[in-house]
Amino acid sequence: MKIAVYGKGGIGKSTTSCNISIALARRGGKVLQIGCDPKHDSTFTLTGFLIPTIIDTLQSKDYHYEEIWPEDVIHKGYGGVDCVEAGGPPAGAGCGGYVVGETVKLLKELNAFYEYDIILFDVLGDVVCGGLAAPLNYADYCVIITDNGFDALFAANRIAVSIGEKTRTHLLRLAGLVGNRTSKRDLIDGYVEVCPMPVIEVLPLIEDIRISRVKGKTLFEMVGSEPSLNYVCEYYLNIADQILSQPEGIVPKEIPDRKFFSLLSDSYLSPINDGKQGKNQENLLGFTMV
């Protein structure tokens, strides 16, 4: 099974991906996480350091694939999760999608791509071009990370459109949304009411999730010294269980951008029309409709 994780930049995809990877491994799967971001920090909380990238290794070998061994590019992470960082071209040059393709090509050359029960692609930022959608070419499922805010849900909607486009030629389905670090879910619920899709899990607004990233540890590793965090790990285990159940998934319905703006702005502005909480809701909106 191959899973692509997408979401707005900075929403917590890598932190969530690492914890999901460990949860999948805890359920008995042999897991590989592939970071698809030039920052090459996807697997940081699994390994505790920035591992060498595929592109770095290929360049050091002058792109002679036959000189590269699995241990050159596959690094062991916490919980038995194997880790790969694709890396990327220099800033302002090249295509991230090409790098993902080279990564998969090399792993196939090493007979490693099909050795895993689950491969999780952690993909950078929003989908703005075909290159960044490249991991969808290999995925069985896509999981979108969001929160209860406008920007994250707007990005989620754009990603859903990309998934719908890919389903025309690939056996890809959207597994659902994961809400990350949010105390409310009203906007998430409003969105999935108009664009039906599963909400796999909503993670609570817990500061330790953010702190884990700074510490370079997953929540599962932090539990060793902070047993009180064990309940947070149950959220990730629930996500893993739902993924492992091989859900039917969906082909997302496309919502045009203007309709999406109206949908969420109405959610904020309705209380204003009622004369209730107007000022607070306006501050939450964070933009002006023109």
Swiss-Prot record:
InterPro entries referenced in this protein's UniProt entry, alphabetically: NifH/chlL_CS (IPR030655), NifH/frxC (IPR000392), P-loop_NTPase (IPR027417), Protochlorophyllide_ATP-bd (IPR005971)
Subcellular location: Plastid, Chloroplast
One of the protein's GO biological processes: photosynthesis, dark reaction
Residues holding ATP: G10, I11, G12, K13, S14, T15, K39, N180, R181
Cofactor entry: [4Fe-4S] cluster
Entry GO MF terms: 4 iron, 4 sulfur cluster binding; ATP binding; metal ion binding; oxidoreductase activity, acting on iron-sulfur proteins as donors; oxidoreductase activity, acting on the CH-CH group of donors, iron-sulfur protein as acceptor
Top-level division of the source organism's lineage: Eukaryota
Keyword Plastid listed: yes
EC code: 1.3.7.7
Pathway: Porphyrin-containing compound metabolism; chlorophyll biosynthesis (light-independent)
Residues involved in Mg(2+) binding: S14
Catalysed reactions, semicolon-separated: chlorophyllide a + oxidized 2[4Fe-4S]-[ferredoxin] + 2 ADP + 2 phosphate = protochlorophyllide a + reduced 2[4Fe-4S]-[ferredoxin] + 2 ATP + 2 H2O
Keyword annotations from UniProtKB, A to Z: 4Fe-4S, ATP-binding, Chlorophyll biosynthesis, Chloroplast, Iron, Iron-sulfur, Magnesium, Metal-binding, Nucleotide-binding, Oxidoreductase, Photosynthesis, Plastid
Broadest EC class assigned to this enzyme: oxidoreductase
Any Pfam family matching the protein: Fer4_NifH
Manner of cofactor binding, per the entry note: Binds 1 [4Fe-4S] cluster per dimer.
Entry binding sites for [4Fe-4S] cluster: C95, C129
CC per GO annotation: chloroplast
Assembly with partners or alone: Homodimer. Protochlorophyllide reductase is composed of three subunits; ChlL, ChlN and ChlB.
NCBIfam families given in the database record: DPOR_bchL
Cited function: Component of the dark-operative protochlorophyllide reductase (DPOR) that uses Mg-ATP and reduced ferredoxin to reduce ring D of protochlorophyllide (Pchlide) to form chlorophyllide a (Chlide). This reaction is light-independent. The L component serves as a unique electron donor to the NB-component of the complex, and binds Mg-ATP.
Family from the record: Belongs to the NifH/BchL/ChlL family.
HAMAP family per the UniProt record, alphabetical: ChlL_BchL
Protein name: Light-independent protochlorophyllide reductase iron-sulfur ATP-binding protein
Source organism of this protein record: Cycas taitungensis (Prince sago)
Lineage, top ranks: Eukaryota, Viridiplantae, Streptophyta, Embryophyta, Tracheophyta
